[in-house]
């Protein structure tokens, strides 16, 4: 089954931030483009079998069906809806960040 992949405003902002950090802070625009391409390719691959990646292990996110897609040093956090055939990308972040804290901030917004 083919799913529609929707990127939230926050996830879009996350992707822009990743690009800007690598391109401008690390002064590596080529690497920034490559990393963004890898992330986008993996995100778009969620149109098929989005349940193939592990569920996030902590509540309340586990009950909501949140899943984790690792992409090199980053994680894509998303929720697949099998009834509507939609995958919603919630966040894209560096894997070394405090994911719980970032999800809590996302919930409060």
What kind of feature is each model-predicted range?
Residues 49-83:
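Basic/aromatic recognition patch in beta-strand/loop cores that engages polyanionic ligands
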């Amino acid at each position: 089954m083919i799913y529609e992949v929707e990127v939230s405003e926050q996830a879009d902002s996350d992707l822009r931030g990743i690009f800007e950090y690598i391109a401008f802070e690390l002064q590596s625009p080529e690497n920034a483009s490559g990393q963004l391409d890898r992330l986008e390719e993996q995100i778009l691959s969620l149109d098929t079998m989005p349940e193939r990646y592990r569920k996030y292990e902590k509540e309340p996110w586990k009950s909501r069906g949140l899943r984790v897609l690792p992409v090199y040093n980053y994680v894509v956090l998303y929720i697949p809806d099998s009834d509507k055939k939609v995958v919603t990308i919630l966040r894209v972040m560096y894997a070394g960040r405090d994911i719980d804290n970032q999800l809590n901030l996302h919930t409060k917004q």
